[in-house]
A protein has these predicted regions:
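Short functional micro-motifs and their immediate structural scaffolds
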Residues: 31-32
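Short cysteine-rich clusters marking metal-coordination/redox-active sites
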Residues: 23-26
Length: 149
């Protein structure tokens, strides 16, 4: 009986890592309410932790997207990324590590670069984005207006 319980626990733990979706760009786990999915012209689906990583993927790999879907931060549902409303550079950044390090002289702390910053949070409705922005700052933009780099 004890051996059976041990095998069950090992199988449970082994399955946990496989269910976690990993970002195709930064290798982080999927961020709650931030995931982004790109279907390329060749049919390949690329999943990223956030919209910022998806844009980075498309720009650096010179790929054309047939379809793009963002997670609506308010509901967790998939929405057409080109029709979503985004809040850029808010104080909410679930994907970023926000590490700080000392400068070469060892005295001052500085933020390290993080590909997921500035944050980019997607919403299906502008009113939800406005409520979010009032509480967390940032700029409301459409897909075509997203600041690139």
């Amino acid at each position: 009986m004890r051996a059976l319980a041990l095998i069950f626990c090992m199988a449970l733990v082994a399955g946990c890592g496989k269910s976690q979706r990993m970002c195709a760009v930064c290798d982080r786990g999927e961020c709650k309410g931030m995931a982004f999915r790109v279907t390329l012209e060749n049919g390949k689906v690329v999943e990223t932790c956030c919209p910022r990583c998806a844009l980075h993927y498309l720009e650096t790999n010179h790929q054309q997207a047939r379809k793009m879907e963002a997670t609506d931060f308010a509901t967790g549902n998939w929405v057409d990324a080109t029709r979503a409303v985004y809040v850029s550079d808010s104080d909410v950044h679930p994907c970023a590590t926000l590490e700080t390090r000392q400068d070469p002289q060892g005295c001052c702390m500085m933020k390290t670069y993080d590909r997921c910053l500035p944050s980019l949070v997607a919403f299906a409705a502008k009113d939800e984005a406005t409520v979010f922005q009032k509480g967390h700052g940032g700029q409301i933009v459409g897909f075509q207006e997203i600041p690139r780099k």
